[in-house]
Amino acid sequence: MVHQQGRLMGYTMSVGVMPLLDTLVEVGYDVHNFLDPIEHDGKRLDLHKVKAAFAGKVAVIGGLNEPRTLEQGTREEIRQEVSDAVRALGPGGGLVLNPVEAIMASTPWRSVEIAIEAWKEVRDYP
């Protein structure tokens, strides 16, 4: 119905994506908002599987965990998560790298700067 009106549709779901991946693609929405690479149980998403399912169908906003990685992570953990997200979700387009769900006041600003620096190094993907 949304597409019949010439509009795009987004869906927000930060965790629990993997078991529903095929269903989410079937829904036919255009943008997946707040894809968190870390589940509540601490397990990491298989971002390559997400990309394979979403490629050419669903754009992703997210890829960078805020509470564990940006707030508490080391420089290397932040850099690695940015690199993982861009390399897995970026090729072919469709990624807006974004902290899920926002940058909190408690987040050290240096962590944000590290994420931006890391993104600048890996943003030119094929």
Could you say what each language-model-derived stretch is?
Residues M1-P126:
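Active-site loop segments of alpha/beta catalytic cores
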